[in-house]
């Protein structure tokens, strides 16, 4: 039984080849404070896989990187319903990478607003 707002392991992008393909062939965009990459492929079993990244170059302390990734995951988890509906409707696999690209430690509300905007853009471009 699936929980309505879950982020299971199957929805995380963990394959090294898939990550390389996403960064090599994916379309990119920028919504402050994120640079994002999206790769859409046709599929018989539509799914979404997501990657969250906070570069060590910008945030030296691991606890700050972990805090930012936790905020990113939570914002995605609570706002991914429209994306999942569009994926099922169009029958595509979508890989998304969110790369936090500022040195500021932003509040959850700012991060959530940006992720909502990115998910809306990805959903529109189906």
Q: Where do the model's predicted regions map?
A:
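Positively charged, solvent-exposed patches that mediate nucleic-acid binding
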Residues: 1-126
